């Protein structure tokens, strides 16, 4: 918790800021506590929101989610104009929007970022994931990694990579369902991007436990089942049983086992559908975990 600033001379908390001199002064004894403070705000004053808007000379902050980072100018709309003037302004807006994406690279980037917006909106991903995916895509463009690959597959791969980097649990199947490309193509683009952008396995590692709450919510499982599933996964990790295995498959099997142990049974099919894996995968991971961890599962 921050301590209240006091005067070092008399310990009074009555301090005054003098914006003209850039000083903080003690109101009681006149001691100058700080000086040469730079005021980062505007030099003008405003007394309401509309006045602030009129006097402000700066636009919106830069955004990595816009192809031009939001630095271009847009021609606005004014319905009070005459019909002839409105028509003229419409033509100007049309030409101005064309100029903003005048070359192929700009058009491709604008399309890629609109695709990113669509994917992240449908997956309900947080903004920091969207921004990280945009950063990865721009870096891929800068390094010439897009050539020979579809924009959609590379952007979907960047979204998947961003999710893994920021530990936001989303499976490749979920992203492939939203993207307009095949899962295998996204997977190839993901591996290529990860290799060339130095996204090491350590950076991209997602603990299976990160998926537990997501899948358990969809299955309607209690906190008790979740805790048991996490215990199973932690033990599996300690024994090296998770290496090279799909996190989704492992979590599905752990939740299936935990649901049996805690009397909240879910079928292998139900668990497989939520995790977007096959029943065979759930069955195989289930057998491995039960056998290697010596778990005694009640017979239904």
UniProtKB/Swiss-Prot annotation:
GO MF term list: DNA-binding transcription factor activity; TBP-class protein binding; zinc ion binding
GO cellular component, one term: transcription preinitiation complex
Presence of keyword Transmembrane helix: no
Keywords linked to the UniProt accession: Metal-binding, Repeat, Transcription, Transcription regulation, Zinc, Zinc-finger
Residues that hold Zn(2+) according to the record: 7, 10, 26, 29
Zinc finger (TFIIB-type): 2-34
Pfam families assigned: TFIIB, Zn_Ribbon_TF
Free-text function comment from the UniProt entry: Stabilizes TBP binding to an archaeal box-A promoter. Also responsible for recruiting RNA polymerase II to the pre-initiation complex (DNA-TBP-TFIIB).
Similarity comment: family membership: Belongs to the TFIIB family.
Protein's recorded name: Transcription initiation factor IIB
Species of the source: Pyrococcus woesei
Gene: tfb
């Amino acid at each position: 918790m921050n301590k209240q600033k006091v005067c070092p001379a008399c310990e009074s908390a009555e301090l005054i800021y003098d914006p003209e001199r850039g000083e903080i002064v003690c109101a009681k004894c006149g001691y100058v506590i700080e000086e040469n403070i730079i005021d980062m705000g505007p030099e003008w004053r405003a007394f309401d929101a509309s006045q602030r808007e009129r006097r402000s000379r700066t636009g919106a902050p830069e955004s990595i989610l816009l192809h031009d980072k939001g630095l271009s100018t847009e021609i606005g709309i004014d319905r009070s104009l005459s019909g002839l003037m409105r028509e003229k302004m419409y033509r100007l807006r049309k030409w101005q929007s064309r100029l903003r994406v005048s070359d192929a690279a700009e058009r491709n980037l604008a399309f890629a970022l609109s695709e990113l917006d669509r994917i992240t909106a449908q997956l309900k991903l947080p903004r920091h994931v969207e921004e990280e995916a945009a950063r990865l895509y721009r870096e891929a463009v800068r390094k010439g990694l897009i050539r020979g690959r579809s924009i959609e597959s590379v952007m979907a791969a960047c979204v998947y990579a961003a999710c893994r980097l920021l530990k936001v649990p989303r499976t490749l199947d979920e992203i492939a369902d939203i993207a307009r490309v095949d899962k295998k193509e996204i997977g190839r683009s993901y591996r290529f991007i990860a290799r060339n952008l130095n996204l090491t396995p350590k950076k991209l590692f997602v603990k299976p436990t990160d998926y537990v709450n997501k899948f358990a919510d969809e299955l309607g499982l209690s906190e008790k089942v979740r805790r048991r599933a996490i215990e199973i996964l932690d033990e599996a990790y300690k024994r090296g049983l998770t290496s090279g295995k799909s996190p989704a498959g492992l979590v599905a099997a752990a939740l299936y086992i935990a649901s049996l142990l805690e009397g909240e049974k879910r079928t292998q099919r139900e668990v497989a559908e939520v995790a977007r894996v096959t029943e065979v995968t759930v069955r195989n991971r289930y057998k491995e975990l039960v056998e290697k961890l010596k778990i005694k599962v009640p017979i239904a």
